[in-house]
């Protein structure tokens, strides 16, 4: 038996954060019904270039959608009155609703939290948006990069001092989906105690802000926050002779000592946190790594018991 066996979820969400949340709930045993608006499906097809594919190719892509796994899907234009009646009937028998529309959109269709609570006051309604249901940015549309930008997390990303960088991964999306699922589970426990439903307001910008927690806790005086980028030589990504890469993270002194002895530079040991020495050390480390292939370095680093990992591509990581 899974944690959410017997729970029913009505999922209005369309892009990554909301569907990731409902996918996690499905993995925990919930019965998830996904509402897909035909007009939204066509919009997404244009966004991702699927409109140029044949019908068979589009169907194959949809069938491979990880975030649809374990869910039932109903194609329903929620802008029609008849669709509203169907959704209200579904809401009567549901425990959880997940949505990712901007504030006011579902309310304007008569499908907001208050509308659904009239037929089911014990509903847990989880709303996922860029910047939440309140505040000056509540009506802003946007995806993962904007959450990273508005939270300040993007300002810390990358090694270049002249400009911030995009991580290239949907970090805020996945974090928000995970946080949303966690919030739903907490609301389920609370409902068991109180018998009351709950409205959950999940902002992608808040989830992305969590990425700043470490630096903010160490620097309550924001003027002391160090510049973006690496400031130490004991971590890095190094190109090998065969074009492969090795990542190292010898932050603890004992691992750094082992690494320095391995590459025959014990004089670096006391310079571990010396930012002035970093560039010269890194340049030398880079040249050293280019003398051997990735498998050769894996063997040497493993023997020396340092902290390292080959940088695997997705095919290698899935093996």
Stretch-by-stretch model annotation:
Residues 133, 161-170, 192-206, 225-230, ...:
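Conserved Rossmann-fold dehydrogenase catalytic segment
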Residues 233-316:
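Aromatic-enriched alpha-helical interface/lid elements that frame and gate functional surfaces
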Residues 74, 200-202, 308:
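Generic structural signal for residues in well-ordered beta-strands
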Residues 77, 99, 202, 248-249:
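Active-site-adjacent beta-strand anchor residues
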Residues 72, 196, 242-245:
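Short acidic/polar mixed-charge low-complexity motifs
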Residues 177-198, 210, 214-220, 260-264:
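Oxidoreductase and adenylate-handling cofactor-binding alpha/beta cores
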Residues 1-193, 222:
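N-terminal helix-loop segment corresponding to the beta1-alpha1 unit
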Residues 56, 64, 225-230, 236-237:
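Short Gly/Pro-enriched turn/cap motifs at secondary-structure boundaries
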């Amino acid at each position: 038996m899974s944690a959410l066996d017997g729970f029913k979820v009505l999922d209005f969400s369309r892009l990554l954060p909301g569907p990731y949340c409902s996918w996690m709930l499905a993995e925990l045993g919930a019965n998830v019904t996904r509402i897909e608006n035909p007009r939204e499906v066509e919009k997404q097809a244009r966004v991702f270039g699927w409109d140029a594919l044949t019908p068979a190719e589009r169907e194959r892509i949809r069938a491979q959608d990880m975030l649809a796994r374990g869910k039932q899907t109903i194609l329903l234009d929620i802008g029609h009155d008849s669709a509203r009646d169907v959704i209200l009937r579904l809401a009567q028998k549901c425990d959880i609703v997940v949505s990712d529309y901007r504030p006011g959109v579902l309310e304007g269709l008569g499908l907001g939290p208050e509308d659904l609570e009239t037929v089911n006051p014990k509903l847990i309604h989880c709303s996922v948006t860029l910047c939440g249901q309140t505040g000056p940015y509540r009506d802003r549309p946007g995806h993962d990069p904007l959450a990273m930008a508005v939270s300040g997390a993007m300002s810390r990303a990358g090694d270049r001092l002249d400009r911030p960088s995009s991580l290239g991964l949907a970090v805020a999306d996945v974090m928000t989906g995970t946080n949303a699922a966690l919030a739903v589970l907490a609301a389920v426990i609370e409902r068991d105690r109180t018998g009351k439903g709950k409205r959950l307001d999940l902002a992608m910008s808040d989830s992305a802000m969590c990425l700043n927690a470490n630096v903010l806790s160490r620097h309550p005086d924001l003027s002391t926050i160090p510049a973006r980028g690496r400031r130490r030589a004991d971590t890095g990504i190094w190109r090998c002779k065969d074009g492969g890469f090795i990542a190292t993270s010898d932050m603890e002194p004992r691992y750094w000592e082992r690494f320095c002895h391995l590459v025959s530079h014990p004089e670096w040991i006391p310079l571990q946190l010396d930012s002035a020495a970093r560039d010269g050390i890194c340049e030398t480390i880079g040249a050293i790594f280019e003398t051997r292939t990735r498998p050769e370095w894996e063997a040497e680093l493993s023997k020396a018991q340092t902290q390292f990992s080959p940088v695997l591509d997705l095919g290698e990581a899935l093996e």
